Amino acid sequence: MIAIIDYGMGNIRSIEQALTSIGVEHLVTDRQREIVKSDGVILPGVGAFPKAMEALEAKKLVTVLQECGKTGKPLLGICLGMQLLFEKSEEMKSSNGLGLLPGVVRKLQVPYKIPHMGWNRLTKTKEMPIWNRVADGSFVYYVHSYYAECPNDMICGTSEYGISVPGLVAKGNIFGAQFHPEKSGEIGIQMLANFKGVVKQWKSSQLSI
């Protein structure tokens, strides 16, 4: 069972539809107990970083998400949800994030239209499970004005938009997609199926303990 975190700022319906299309058992929840019992977590997000953190804090979800990350449970952040995984953001004001990944979220300073919206090529920079059966250079769908500045060894895929934008990041059991896999057609669906595989493998490892 994958828990989709409902804190009032996520593109939940599209993610639900994508997971349903590939037979992934899931639930939308803001309950700590259900999140703890889940086998994997998806943290969506659309909007501003400070308001998102305030919403998570109001629902008392910050600690449970941090614990999920630290215990090895697979966690996938999407768009703003990916940004929330990092230590800090400069959006609107300096705000602390979940601190599960090292790095700072900064505003795109590029000679192009902001937000970065539409299809862009994702170039593989490092192998990770979510790349399975996905061709290097596949096109994915973005909508964002901020990006994660983070260590190179975490970056698994980038897109060019005036700068090299980290599109896919990973560290241990924590994964982040700056783009929207649920809006990225068959490529995005395959990536979500790959995350399902990561969750299944982790669940099996827990049963064998």
From Swiss-Prot:
It comes from the Bacteria. IGPS catalyzes the conversion of PRFAR and glutamine to IGP, AICAR and glutamate. The HisH subunit catalyzes the hydrolysis of glutamine to glutamate and ammonia as part of the synthesis of IGP and AICAR. The resulting ammonia molecule is channeled to the active site of HisF. It is found in: Cytoplasm. This is Imidazole glycerol phosphate synthase subunit HisH. The active site is at C79, H180, E182. Its EC number is 4.3.2.10, 3.5.1.2. GO terms for cellular component: cytoplasm. The keyword Hydrolase applies. Heterodimer of HisH and HisF. InterPro entries: Class_I_gatase-like (IPR029062), GATASE (IPR017926), Imidazole-glycPsynth_HisH (IPR010139). GO terms for biological process: L-histidine biosynthetic process. It catalyses: 5-[(5-phospho-1-deoxy-D-ribulos-1-ylimino)methylamino]-1-(5-phospho-beta-D-ribosyl)imidazole-4-carboxamide + L-glutamine = D-erythro-1-(imidazol-4-yl)glycerol 3-phosphate + 5-amino-1-(5-phospho-beta-D-ribosyl)imidazole-4-carboxamide + L-glutamate + H(+); L-glutamine + H2O = L-glutamate + NH4(+). GO terms for molecular function: glutaminase activity; imidazoleglycerol-phosphate synthase activity; lyase activity. Keywords: Amino-acid biosynthesis, Cytoplasm, Glutamine amidotransferase, Histidine biosynthesis, Hydrolase, Lyase.
